[in-house]
Amino acid sequence: LSSAGCGVHSAYIVDRGGSVVTPANMLVSVDWTRILDDVSTAHVVVIPDGDCCAQLGNVRTWRHKLVLARDGVTVWEGPIIQAEWSFGKVELWASDILVWLDRRVPHQSIVFDGSDLTDIANWLIEDAFAPDDPGHTVDILNPSGVEGGRQYTEDIGQTGDHLRDLADTGLDYTAIGSTIVLMPEDWDASVGMLTDVDFPEGLVVAEDGSALATRYIVHGDDDSGVKGVSGGTDSYYGLLERSVEETSVTTNASAASAARSKRAAAYPVPVFLSSDEVTLSPEAAVDVAKLVPGWCVDVATAATCRPLRQRLKIGGVKVSEDGDGESVQVTLAPLSSDLGD
Protein backbone atom coordinates (compact mmCIF):
# COMPACT_ATOMS: atom_id res chain seq x y z
CA LEU A 1 0.00 0.00 0.00
CA SER A 2 1.43 3.35 -1.08
CA SER A 3 -0.04 5.98 1.26
CA ALA A 4 -1.36 9.36 0.15
CA GLY A 5 1.12 12.13 0.82
CA CYS A 6 4.17 9.89 1.21
CA GLY A 7 5.07 9.05 -2.38
CA VAL A 8 8.30 9.72 -4.27
CA HIS A 9 8.15 10.21 -8.03
CA SER A 10 10.47 9.44 -10.91
CA ALA A 11 10.08 10.43 -14.56
CA TYR A 12 11.23 9.12 -17.92
CA ILE A 13 11.02 10.35 -21.48
CA VAL A 14 10.12 7.50 -23.82
CA ASP A 15 10.28 7.47 -27.62
CA ARG A 16 7.24 6.46 -29.63
CA GLY A 17 9.15 3.32 -30.62
CA GLY A 18 9.45 2.29 -26.97
CA SER A 19 13.07 3.15 -26.15
CA VAL A 20 13.93 5.39 -23.19
CA VAL A 21 15.24 8.76 -24.40
CA THR A 22 16.38 9.86 -20.95
CA PRO A 23 15.42 9.65 -17.30
CA ALA A 24 14.62 12.96 -15.60
CA ASN A 25 16.95 12.53 -12.67
CA MET A 26 16.66 15.92 -10.96
CA LEU A 27 12.93 16.50 -10.50
CA VAL A 28 12.00 19.84 -8.92
CA SER A 29 8.25 19.28 -9.05
CA VAL A 30 5.72 16.80 -10.43
CA ASP A 31 1.99 17.24 -11.00
CA TRP A 32 -0.32 14.69 -12.57
CA THR A 33 -4.04 14.17 -12.77
CA ARG A 34 -6.59 11.54 -13.62
CA ILE A 35 -9.98 12.68 -14.91
CA LEU A 36 -13.27 10.97 -15.68
CA ASP A 37 -14.65 11.44 -19.20
CA ASP A 38 -11.87 13.76 -20.38
CA VAL A 39 -8.14 14.16 -20.99
CA SER A 40 -5.81 14.21 -17.97
CA THR A 41 -2.52 16.11 -17.83
CA ALA A 42 0.91 16.08 -16.22
CA HIS A 43 3.66 18.66 -15.69
CA VAL A 44 7.25 18.25 -14.54
CA VAL A 45 10.09 20.67 -13.83
CA VAL A 46 13.55 19.18 -14.25
CA ILE A 47 17.04 20.48 -13.49
CA PRO A 48 19.19 19.07 -16.31
CA ASP A 49 22.52 17.58 -15.30
CA GLY A 50 25.39 16.32 -17.46
CA ASP A 51 24.34 14.12 -20.35
CA CYS A 52 20.72 14.56 -19.30
CA CYS A 53 20.80 18.15 -20.58
CA ALA A 54 21.69 17.11 -24.12
CA GLN A 55 19.08 14.36 -24.09
CA LEU A 56 16.38 16.69 -22.75
CA GLY A 57 17.29 19.05 -25.58
CA ASN A 58 16.24 16.32 -27.99
CA VAL A 59 12.72 16.02 -26.59
CA ARG A 60 10.08 16.52 -29.28
CA THR A 61 6.36 17.02 -28.76
CA TRP A 62 4.03 14.19 -29.84
CA ARG A 63 7.03 12.01 -30.80
CA HIS A 64 7.99 11.45 -27.16
CA LYS A 65 5.87 10.65 -24.13
CA LEU A 66 6.28 11.37 -20.43
CA VAL A 67 6.09 8.38 -18.08
CA LEU A 68 5.69 8.97 -14.33
CA ALA A 69 6.24 6.42 -11.60
CA ARG A 70 5.32 6.78 -7.92
CA ASP A 71 7.30 4.61 -5.53
CA GLY A 72 8.38 2.53 -8.50
CA VAL A 73 4.85 1.95 -9.85
CA THR A 74 3.89 3.61 -13.15
CA VAL A 75 0.93 5.90 -12.46
CA TRP A 76 0.70 8.11 -15.54
CA GLU A 77 1.89 8.36 -19.15
CA GLY A 78 1.08 10.30 -22.28
CA PRO A 79 2.50 12.32 -25.17
CA ILE A 80 4.44 15.49 -24.45
CA ILE A 81 2.43 18.43 -25.78
CA GLN A 82 4.66 21.35 -24.80
CA ALA A 83 8.32 21.72 -23.82
CA GLU A 84 10.25 24.75 -22.60
CA TRP A 85 14.01 25.03 -22.11
CA SER A 86 15.47 27.82 -19.99
CA PHE A 87 18.77 28.32 -18.18
CA GLY A 88 19.14 25.47 -15.71
CA LYS A 89 15.56 24.26 -16.09
CA VAL A 90 13.38 22.19 -18.41
CA GLU A 91 9.59 22.10 -18.17
CA LEU A 92 7.41 19.50 -19.85
CA TRP A 93 3.64 19.36 -20.21
CA ALA A 94 1.91 16.19 -21.33
CA SER A 95 -1.60 14.78 -21.82
CA ASP A 96 -2.78 11.20 -21.57
CA ILE A 97 -3.49 8.90 -24.51
CA LEU A 98 -7.02 10.30 -24.90
CA VAL A 99 -5.54 13.53 -26.31
CA TRP A 100 -4.80 11.63 -29.53
CA LEU A 101 -8.57 11.32 -30.04
CA ASP A 102 -8.80 15.11 -30.11
CA ARG A 103 -6.50 14.96 -33.13
CA ARG A 104 -8.34 12.17 -34.93
CA VAL A 105 -11.56 12.07 -36.96
CA PRO A 106 -13.89 9.24 -38.04
CA HIS A 107 -12.23 7.44 -40.96
CA GLN A 108 -15.41 5.89 -42.32
CA SER A 109 -19.12 6.61 -42.21
CA ILE A 110 -21.30 4.38 -40.03
CA VAL A 111 -24.79 4.23 -38.52
CA PHE A 112 -25.53 2.61 -35.15
CA ASP A 113 -29.12 1.70 -34.34
CA GLY A 114 -29.68 0.35 -30.84
CA SER A 115 -26.07 -0.50 -29.99
CA ASP A 116 -24.74 -0.30 -26.44
CA LEU A 117 -22.77 2.90 -25.86
CA THR A 118 -19.66 0.91 -24.93
CA ASP A 119 -19.71 -0.78 -28.35
CA ILE A 120 -20.06 2.59 -30.07
CA ALA A 121 -17.23 4.05 -27.99
CA ASN A 122 -15.01 1.07 -28.74
CA TRP A 123 -15.64 1.50 -32.47
CA LEU A 124 -14.78 5.21 -32.28
CA ILE A 125 -11.50 4.48 -30.52
CA GLU A 126 -10.45 1.61 -32.79
CA ASP A 127 -11.38 3.58 -35.91
CA ALA A 128 -9.42 6.60 -34.67
CA PHE A 129 -6.24 4.58 -34.09
CA ALA A 130 -6.58 2.30 -37.13
CA PRO A 131 -4.41 4.39 -39.52
CA ASP A 132 -1.69 5.06 -36.93
CA ASP A 133 -1.63 3.53 -33.45
CA PRO A 134 0.65 5.08 -30.79
CA GLY A 135 0.05 1.96 -28.71
CA HIS A 136 -3.27 1.48 -26.96
CA THR A 137 -5.67 -1.08 -25.54
CA VAL A 138 -9.36 -0.82 -24.67
CA ASP A 139 -10.77 -2.43 -21.53
CA ILE A 140 -14.56 -2.73 -21.35
CA LEU A 141 -15.51 -3.39 -17.72
CA ASN A 142 -19.22 -3.86 -18.44
CA PRO A 143 -21.76 -2.77 -21.06
CA SER A 144 -23.27 0.62 -20.29
CA GLY A 145 -26.81 -0.75 -20.42
CA VAL A 146 -27.76 2.29 -22.51
CA GLU A 147 -28.71 1.83 -26.14
CA GLY A 148 -27.57 4.47 -28.58
CA GLY A 149 -28.60 5.47 -32.05
CA ARG A 150 -25.65 7.36 -33.53
CA GLN A 151 -24.42 8.33 -36.96
CA TYR A 152 -20.85 9.32 -37.82
CA THR A 153 -19.61 10.67 -41.13
CA GLU A 154 -16.11 10.24 -42.50
CA ASP A 155 -13.84 13.21 -41.67
CA ILE A 156 -16.59 15.08 -39.77
CA GLY A 157 -15.91 16.07 -36.15
CA GLN A 158 -13.15 15.12 -33.74
CA THR A 159 -13.33 11.62 -32.31
CA GLY A 160 -12.65 12.95 -28.81
CA ASP A 161 -15.75 15.14 -29.02
CA HIS A 162 -17.83 12.19 -30.22
CA LEU A 163 -16.62 10.19 -27.21
CA ARG A 164 -17.47 13.01 -24.78
CA ASP A 165 -20.95 13.12 -26.31
CA LEU A 166 -21.45 9.46 -25.41
CA ALA A 167 -20.33 10.23 -21.85
CA ASP A 168 -23.15 12.78 -21.61
CA THR A 169 -25.75 10.05 -22.14
CA GLY A 170 -24.76 7.03 -20.06
CA LEU A 171 -21.10 6.04 -20.49
CA ASP A 172 -17.97 6.67 -18.42
CA TYR A 173 -14.37 6.38 -19.57
CA THR A 174 -10.87 7.16 -18.37
CA ALA A 175 -7.24 6.46 -19.24
CA ILE A 176 -4.88 4.30 -17.19
CA GLY A 177 -1.50 4.51 -18.88
CA SER A 178 -2.01 3.42 -22.49
CA THR A 179 -5.31 1.67 -21.68
CA ILE A 180 -8.67 3.36 -22.27
CA VAL A 181 -11.24 1.99 -19.83
CA LEU A 182 -14.96 2.00 -20.71
CA MET A 183 -17.60 1.42 -18.03
CA PRO A 184 -21.27 2.08 -17.24
CA GLU A 185 -22.12 5.21 -15.27
CA ASP A 186 -23.34 3.06 -12.38
CA TRP A 187 -20.03 1.18 -12.05
CA ASP A 188 -19.59 1.01 -8.27
CA ALA A 189 -16.50 -1.07 -7.51
CA SER A 190 -14.84 0.36 -4.38
CA VAL A 191 -11.10 0.82 -3.85
CA GLY A 192 -11.18 1.79 -0.18
CA MET A 193 -12.85 3.48 2.77
CA LEU A 194 -12.43 7.09 3.95
CA THR A 195 -13.57 8.56 7.27
CA ASP A 196 -13.25 11.93 9.01
CA VAL A 197 -9.66 11.26 10.09
CA ASP A 198 -8.65 10.93 6.44
CA PHE A 199 -9.61 14.55 5.70
CA PRO A 200 -7.21 16.69 7.77
CA GLU A 201 -8.33 19.94 6.14
CA GLY A 202 -11.98 19.20 6.84
CA LEU A 203 -14.84 18.72 4.42
CA VAL A 204 -18.27 20.05 3.51
CA VAL A 205 -21.31 17.84 2.93
CA ALA A 206 -23.62 19.42 0.36
CA GLU A 207 -27.04 18.68 -1.10
CA ASP A 208 -27.33 20.09 -4.61
CA GLY A 209 -31.00 20.78 -5.23
CA SER A 210 -30.20 22.61 -8.45
CA ALA A 211 -29.33 19.26 -10.04
CA LEU A 212 -32.62 17.54 -9.15
CA ALA A 213 -35.00 16.45 -11.90
CA THR A 214 -37.95 14.07 -11.53
CA ARG A 215 -38.77 14.12 -15.25
CA TYR A 216 -36.17 14.30 -18.04
CA ILE A 217 -36.86 14.89 -21.73
CA VAL A 218 -34.17 14.36 -24.36
CA HIS A 219 -34.71 15.63 -27.91
CA GLY A 220 -32.69 14.72 -30.96
CA ASP A 221 -31.98 17.21 -33.71
CA ASP A 222 -34.70 19.87 -34.14
CA ASP A 223 -35.88 18.48 -37.46
CA SER A 224 -35.78 14.80 -36.51
CA GLY A 225 -38.76 14.59 -34.15
CA VAL A 226 -36.75 12.20 -31.97
CA LYS A 227 -37.75 12.35 -28.29
CA GLY A 228 -37.30 10.30 -25.14
CA VAL A 229 -38.87 10.81 -21.70
CA SER A 230 -38.10 9.39 -18.27
CA GLY A 231 -39.92 9.99 -14.98
CA GLY A 232 -42.78 12.24 -13.94
CA THR A 233 -44.28 13.75 -10.80
CA ASP A 234 -42.59 12.44 -7.66
CA SER A 235 -44.61 11.79 -4.50
CA TYR A 236 -41.92 13.39 -2.32
CA TYR A 237 -40.38 16.19 -4.41
CA GLY A 238 -43.24 17.01 -6.75
CA LEU A 239 -42.52 17.75 -10.41
CA LEU A 240 -39.19 19.17 -11.59
CA GLU A 241 -38.60 18.90 -15.34
CA ARG A 242 -35.53 19.25 -17.55
CA SER A 243 -35.56 19.32 -21.34
CA VAL A 244 -32.30 19.06 -23.29
CA GLU A 245 -31.22 18.61 -26.88
CA GLU A 246 -28.73 15.89 -27.85
CA THR A 247 -28.29 16.36 -31.57
CA SER A 248 -26.29 13.16 -32.00
CA VAL A 249 -29.17 10.97 -30.74
CA THR A 250 -30.94 9.52 -33.78
CA THR A 251 -33.68 7.18 -32.46
CA ASN A 252 -36.52 7.43 -29.95
CA ALA A 253 -35.19 4.39 -28.09
CA SER A 254 -31.75 5.93 -27.63
CA ALA A 255 -33.34 9.24 -26.59
CA ALA A 256 -35.36 7.38 -23.95
CA SER A 257 -32.21 5.62 -22.72
CA ALA A 258 -30.39 8.94 -22.55
CA ALA A 259 -33.27 10.53 -20.63
CA ARG A 260 -33.25 7.69 -18.11
CA SER A 261 -29.48 7.95 -17.69
CA LYS A 262 -29.69 11.69 -17.08
CA ARG A 263 -32.51 11.26 -14.55
CA ALA A 264 -30.53 8.58 -12.72
CA ALA A 265 -27.74 11.13 -12.24
CA ALA A 266 -30.16 13.82 -11.02
CA TYR A 267 -32.60 11.89 -8.79
CA PRO A 268 -32.85 11.80 -5.84
CA VAL A 269 -31.11 15.04 -4.84
CA PRO A 270 -27.35 14.43 -5.13
CA VAL A 271 -25.54 14.55 -1.77
CA PHE A 272 -21.76 14.73 -1.90
CA LEU A 273 -18.58 16.26 -0.54
CA SER A 274 -18.72 19.78 -1.92
CA SER A 275 -15.02 20.62 -2.03
CA ASP A 276 -13.85 20.38 -5.62
CA GLU A 277 -10.75 18.60 -4.42
CA VAL A 278 -10.52 16.93 -1.01
CA THR A 279 -6.98 16.56 0.35
CA LEU A 280 -6.25 13.14 1.82
CA SER A 281 -4.25 12.43 4.96
CA PRO A 282 -0.97 10.51 4.55
CA GLU A 283 -2.54 7.91 6.86
CA ALA A 284 -5.58 7.41 4.59
CA ALA A 285 -6.11 3.69 3.97
CA VAL A 286 -6.20 3.91 0.18
CA ASP A 287 -3.61 2.99 -2.44
CA VAL A 288 -2.96 6.08 -4.56
CA ALA A 289 -2.23 3.96 -7.64
CA LYS A 290 -5.75 2.52 -7.37
CA LEU A 291 -7.49 5.91 -7.16
CA VAL A 292 -8.88 5.74 -10.68
CA PRO A 293 -11.81 7.88 -11.91
CA GLY A 294 -14.92 5.79 -12.40
CA TRP A 295 -14.15 3.63 -9.38
CA CYS A 296 -15.58 4.48 -5.96
CA VAL A 297 -14.62 4.99 -2.34
CA ASP A 298 -16.86 4.44 0.66
CA VAL A 299 -17.12 7.62 2.72
CA ALA A 300 -18.33 7.86 6.32
CA THR A 301 -18.39 11.25 8.04
CA ALA A 302 -20.13 12.47 11.17
CA ALA A 303 -18.22 15.74 11.48
CA THR A 304 -21.11 17.92 10.30
CA CYS A 305 -24.82 18.24 11.14
CA ARG A 306 -25.52 16.14 8.03
CA PRO A 307 -23.92 12.72 8.58
CA LEU A 308 -22.94 10.98 5.37
CA ARG A 309 -22.29 7.32 4.79
CA GLN A 310 -22.33 6.33 1.16
CA ARG A 311 -20.31 5.19 -1.81
CA LEU A 312 -19.03 8.08 -3.92
CA LYS A 313 -17.53 7.97 -7.40
CA ILE A 314 -14.01 9.25 -8.01
CA GLY A 315 -14.35 12.03 -10.57
CA GLY A 316 -10.73 13.15 -10.55
CA VAL A 317 -7.36 12.78 -8.84
CA LYS A 318 -4.60 15.37 -8.53
CA VAL A 319 -1.17 14.45 -7.19
CA SER A 320 1.62 16.98 -6.64
CA GLU A 321 5.14 16.60 -5.26
CA ASP A 322 7.79 19.26 -4.70
CA GLY A 323 10.35 20.18 -2.07
CA ASP A 324 7.62 20.49 0.56
CA GLY A 325 6.39 16.93 0.05
CA GLU A 326 3.42 15.32 -1.66
CA SER A 327 -0.25 16.25 -1.81
CA VAL A 328 -3.03 13.91 -2.98
CA GLN A 329 -6.46 15.35 -3.76
CA VAL A 330 -9.60 13.59 -4.98
CA THR A 331 -12.88 14.79 -6.43
CA LEU A 332 -15.83 12.72 -5.21
CA ALA A 333 -19.29 12.78 -6.77
CA PRO A 334 -22.59 10.92 -6.29
CA LEU A 335 -23.23 7.65 -8.08
CA SER A 336 -26.06 7.39 -10.56
CA SER A 337 -29.08 5.99 -8.73
CA ASP A 338 -30.92 2.76 -9.45
CA LEU A 339 -34.27 4.10 -10.62
CA GLY A 340 -35.98 0.72 -10.42
CA ASP A 341 -38.28 1.44 -13.36
Regions found by a protein language model. Name each.
Residues 86-90, 95-210:
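Charged- and aromatic-enriched interaction segments used to assemble
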Residues 1-119:
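Beta-strand-rich assembly/attachment modules of structural machines
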Residues 2-17, 188-324, 336-341:
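Acidic, small/polar-enriched beta strand-loop surface segments
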Residues 23-29, 80, 146-150, 198-202, ...:
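A broad structural signal for short, well-ordered beta-strand segments within beta-sheet-rich domains
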Residues 32-52, 89-100, 218, 268-284, ...:
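Oligomerization/assembly interface segments of phage tail-like spikes and tubes
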Residues 14, 31-33, 45-47, 69-71, ...:
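A structural detector for beta-sheet-dominated domains
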Residues 67-94, 299-329:
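Short beta-strand and beta-hairpin "edge-sheet" elements
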